[in-house]
Amino acid sequence: MKKLLAAFIISLIAAQIHAADKSLLDAAKAEGKASFYANITAVEPIMKAFIADTGVKAEYTRISTTKFVATAVTEFEAGKFMADVVQAPLPVLELLKGKGMLAAYRSPAAAGYPDWTRKDDRIQLFGIEYVALIYNKELVKKTDVPRRYEDLTDPRWRNKIVMADPGTHPTTISWLIGLKENVFKSEAEWMKFLRGLAANKPMFVASFGPTPAPVESGEKLIAISMPKYIVTKAPAPLDWARVEQPMLGTPRAIAITSKAPHPNAAKLFMDYWLSKKAMDVLAKEVGEYVLAPGVFPPIEGISSAKVVAIRELSDDEIQKWGNQFKKIFDVR
């Protein structure tokens, strides 16, 4: 009798969930589309899958991390913010939350994610913007591949490194502070590393996006960048250095906007984005490090790598350290 009752309850709950899903889908279809502002790149496979599976149109607007807050806040204050869903590094969404730009929504699709990924009812973490040393495996000998972050200070890499601007790129600023707090034993050791890296005269670009190209071409040999490009730039001769220290990264977050023009489509899109199907696509086709249990990108060695989510920096900290790094790296 108890088994029959349990089975009945389970079937009833399943029916309710199905009805809720259909209701949301119907409402989203009536709204017509979901607008997605994101700093993440190469997400077209998920956008296409969402459209095919739901019949709801999805529009993707890519905004670089350095311009995200300014663009979003300016549009919001002018009453022209058209995003239904926003995705960016956690510090960026925390800033938007502080401006009242995010709505409360706890997606059922994230029920299996680790508890620490739910910051609150407004922000859900789904991945880590992992940063590593990416090198040209055809031009760098295996014996020369860095084994520690400190190896970047070796004079052999002078004028051979490319990285996002440490004075303005929030994720790079956070990564450098992450090294200070998670890798180096003292501030003196960390400062020695910074000055040694700066002495090697890295090329600075606006964000991670442009970092692989100079390494692919051989103009530079190493990029402080993301392993995902090994997937998205294949068959380019890229590999990542298996350094002894942990790989660090800023948590990637997603949220619905407080004045979403299409609120039901926004919920449907966020649910889809956090689903295992979408996370599989994000990992396997885009190379992202996601937080859905058991899902990893098809990059040799990544599934066993130690990846540490570094803490979020406040806007004041980003500005403070960005200004200091401009001086250390002589950014002009």
Cite the ranges covered by each PLM segment:
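Extracytoplasmic ligand-binding site segments that recognize negatively charged/polar headgroups
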Residues: 37-48, 59-219
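Short, polar/charged alpha-helical segment
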Residues: 21-57, 133, 284
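A bilobed periplasmic-binding-protein/Venus flytrap-type ligand-binding module shared by bacterial periplasmic
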Residues: 134-139, 177-181, 250-262, 281-282
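Periplasmic-binding protein-like
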Residues: 115, 128-129, 159-167, 193-198, 204-205, 273-295, ...
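A ligand-binding cleft/hinge motif common to bilobed small-molecule-binding domains
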Residues: 90-95, 216-239
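Extracellular/periplasmic bilobal clamshell ligand-binding domains
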Residues: 278, 297-332
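Bacterial N-terminal signal peptides
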Residues: 6-15
